[in-house]
Each structure stands twice: as C-alpha cells, then as structure tokens.
C-alpha cells in the first residue's frame, strides 16, 4: 500500500479507504477498536475520530453510539463525492469510470439543456455566450465546459440537475484538463456551444436532443482515442 497523503488526518483517511478497497476491512465487517486502529495507523485518537466521522458522512462507514463502527458497501451508501477516490484507487478502472461519466452527462444533459433553452432562453443564452470569449487552451476550456453544462443545468429550473453536476466537478475537471489538451476536442466543443446558440435563436427545439447526443458520441470517440496517452497519475492523492 503506497499512501501519499501529507497530513496525519489525510494519511489515516487514505489508509482506511485503501484498506476497505483492498478488503483488509471488507464491506460488512467491523473496524478495529479506536485505540487499536489509532496505534495501527500511527495517529492520535482525536485525529482518527475526526477521520471516521468524515468517512461516515461520505458513506464509507456507519457509526452508531455504543456500537462498533461498521464498514459499508460503499457502492450502495456513498454519493458522487467518491468518484475521484475510486479513480485514484484503481487506475485500471478509470477508462470505464469515465465512459460511464460521459454517458450519464449525455443522458441527463439532453433533458436539462432542452428544458433550459425552451423554458428559460434568456438564462440559457447568457450561459452559452460565455463560449465566445474563451482562450484556446485546455484549462480555459475545462472551466468553460463545466461552467456551461452546470449553468444550463441550473437554468433548466430544476436545481437537482445542478447538484448532480456539482457532485461530478472533481472528476469532470481533472479529466477535462487531459481531454481539452486536444485541439480537436476544443473545436468540437466550441461548435457544439454555437450549435446550441443557433438552435436557441431559431427556436428549432426539436434539434436539441440529437445535438446533445451527437456531441456525446463524437466527444466519446475523441476521448477513446486519447486513452493511450492518459496520465498515469490522472488523480493525485489528497
């Protein structure tokens, strides 16, 4: 087990999460007692207690007063906040994880983008027009792409879509820095934003879903072509 965290709390969190992932503390099992675990990891009980509370909030553990701390099946109890952690723990699974992320983005965005453009065109226009001033480099496009999808999610009038995008931000932006290093990806994205603006201006709302799905398909093709050059440390440890 190689742990790169620098603070005692970060080290303890990494240790416990990796132990759960590697089945040293398998789902359904009971964690060692606080004193034993703090000595095993090499941190104070106060630090360990804070870490355990944080991991419980993220769905890794169940803590009940007077009962031993139980390890959860995190797939069933955790939220989107653990995506970065999962990608870091198992680099081999990153391509599939990102494929799933792109698929989810396409499926939900075809709904909220259509709703935003049809129902709240002024808000949608304001979001999309930010694409007109973006600098042609990876970091700028990463921020822009996330901002546009998130902005349209909130502009749809259903804030739940925006909250989903909030939960995806960490992995979304880290992947984006690699993806948008490809000029073809930046050109495709800019064309997509302008296409949505044109649909908004012409009120050809029936074209929205196909436009979003086509962008999802073509961006997926670019991404698949870039996987061979994906950084080994796509997601650094905390």
From Swiss-Prot:
Ranges annotated as DNA-binding: 34-53
Principal location listed in the UniProt entry: cytoplasm
Compartments in which it is found: Cytoplasm
Record's keyword annotation contains Ribosomal protein: no
PROSITE patterns reported for this sequence: HTH_GNTR
One Gene Ontology biological process: regulation of fatty acid metabolic process
Cited CDD domains: WHTH_GntR
One GO cellular component term noted in the UniProt record for this chain: cytoplasm
GO molecular-function term, one example from the UniProt record: DNA-binding transcription factor activity
SUPFAM superfamilies: GntR ligand-binding domain-like (SSF48008), Winged helix' DNA-binding domain (SSF46785)
Domain HTH gntR-type: 6-74
Top-level taxonomic group: Bacteria
Keyword annotations from UniProtKB, A to Z: Activator, Cytoplasm, DNA-binding, Fatty acid metabolism, Lipid metabolism, Repressor, Transcription, Transcription regulation
Biological role: Multifunctional regulator of fatty acid metabolism.
Assembly description: Homodimer.
Name assigned to this protein: Fatty acid metabolism regulator protein
Annotated gene: fadR
């Amino acid at each position: 087990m190689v742990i790169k965290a620098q603070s005692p709390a970060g080290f303890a969190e990494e240790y416990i999460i990796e132990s759960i992932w590697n089945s040293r503390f398998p789902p359904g099992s009971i964690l060692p007692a606080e004193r034993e675990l703090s000595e095993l990891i090499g941190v104070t009980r106060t630090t360990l207690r804070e870490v355990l509370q944080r991991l419980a909030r993220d769905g890794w553990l169940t803590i009940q007063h007077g009962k031993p701390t139980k390890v959860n099946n995190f797939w069933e109890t955790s939220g989107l906040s653990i995506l970065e952690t999962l990608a870091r723990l198992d680099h081999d699974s990153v391509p599939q994880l990102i494929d799933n992320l792109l698929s989810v983005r396409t499926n939900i965005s075809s709904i909220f983008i259509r709703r935003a453009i049809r129902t709240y065109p002024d808000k949608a226009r304001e979001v999309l027009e930010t694409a007109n001033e973006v600098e042609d480099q990876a970091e700028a496009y990463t921020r822009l792409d996330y901002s546009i999808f998130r902005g349209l999610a909130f502009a749809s009038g259903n804030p739940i879509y925006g909250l989903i995008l909030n939960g995806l931000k960490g992995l979304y932006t880290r992947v984006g820095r690699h993806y948008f290093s490809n000029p073809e990806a930046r050109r495709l994205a800019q064309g997509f934003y302008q296409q949505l603006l044109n649909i908004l201006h012409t009120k050809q709302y029936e074209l929205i879903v196909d436009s979003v799905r086509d962008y999802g398909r073509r961006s997926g093709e670019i991404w698949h072509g870039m996987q061979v050059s994906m950084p080994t440390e796509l997601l650094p440890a905390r």
